[in-house]
Amino acid sequence: GKCGDRGETIKTVFAATMDASRALQHKMMDGGADLRKEITAALQDGPIAVAPGECIACAGVEGAYASIAGARLFPGVPIKYYKYFENVFEAVDKGEARYGIIPVENSTAGSVHESYDLIMKYRFFMVGARDEKIEHCLAAHPDTRYEDVESIYSHHQALTQCSNFIENFGFTGITYSNTAAAAKYVAQSDRRDIAAICSPTAAKKYGLQVMKREIQNISNNRTRFVVISKDMQISSDADKISLIFRVPHTTGSLYRVLGRFSMAGLNLTKIESRPMGNGEFSYFFYVDIMGSVRRDVTLDLLCALSDELPGFKFLGNFREQED
């Protein structure tokens, strides 16, 4: 057109201006009122806490990485163990546990899609998080010799995180429900040609000998665990926001949404697409942002997006702990 090379730039600026104008109109018309009400009611004066007599839930058995993260997030709080991630959600849903601790992302293996799928299925919220350094070791029965080991049992994420070690030494990786459960299985088995990939904590707990330490592909191997809750709670020190949404099938629609976060002064720390699984090329986006809903600009934007974007879900605003 007449604008020449600058046409696209002008179009982008114009679109952004229109979006900003729409957001302002949206607030004046009390848009996103339901989300605003829900978020306002969830604001707390202090950190999230577990009442006396309540417990938290995680998958696996004692020594599982989730239980290590849980014990650091909620010191001294009893932990109930369940076999699978979904059992953790069921426990929280039924009130058997106040919160659940589940992994959502690993620095080597990526997002734990099952966790996000379950958060959507149960319509739960993230109310806390912890970024945990994961140190895997190879552990076996005290009577097992290293040269006799052929098969290694562990959770599929742990096998992925230690794939170089497994391939280099010609081991066969066998998927098990959980790293600590794999350690327990190896400890109780009569076989002397198997080992487990687990935490040093789990190896010690089940009386296994540690044959090799730090066998993960990347030395700084980290997993993010989130605290899941049936109801929305936003602690006073919350600094991270998680969202899921879809965008319309129009050119630049995702770019425009991301531009609005930028205009609101929000820093994206994660964006990931996930097929919706309906046979069409439709995608959900997981987005993490540094920020707090206590800031008006942030809350206004989330309320506007909740009305505009299909499949929008505010997953929570929480504090993330690190080592």
Per-region residue spans from a language model:
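Domain-level signature for soluble enzymes in the chorismate/prephenate branch of the shikimate pathway
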Residues: 1-323
